[in-house]
Amino acid sequence: MTANTVITVATTQSPDAKPIAVSKTLTTNFTPLITVPSFEIPELVFGGSTVLAPGIAEVISPLIISNKTANTVYIDVQVFRLYDYSADPPIDVTSTFSLATNIPIPGYDTLPFPLNGQFFYNGDVLEAKSNVNDAIDVTISYTIGQAEEFLED
């Protein structure tokens, strides 16, 4: 996925909290684990136009990291933020922030990386990579829905 791109989901009603589970095998390139879309929904007015509503994802589990090899492998976890919603009105950020760098995962071990309760907004991407291809499996669960308080024109 290219940076500065927000996927838009056209729907008649966006979800409040659709549960999603993701399991992926990491490579030496950053692999997207959570990508948050916007929702194109009907505007409740005469004439039937649509409006863009930003999406939001809430992490409900730790990132489970499992090493399938006998050797210690290292992983990095980062988030790409498109907007800063702590500002009013939201401002463009388009920056990548490291959450963890070179976490050692011992051979045949499984570790939880706590992300429970973290929020990601439309355009945000949570990514992870390993220093060895196909040695690490990761699993994370989250809910995705519409961030109603941040309606866009």
Located regions from the model:
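Intrinsically disordered, low-complexity Pro/Gly/Ser/Thr-rich segments with frequent PxxP/GP/PP motifs
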Residues: 83-125
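Short acidic, flexible loop segments centered on an aromatic residue
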Residues: 62, 66-88, 130, 142-143
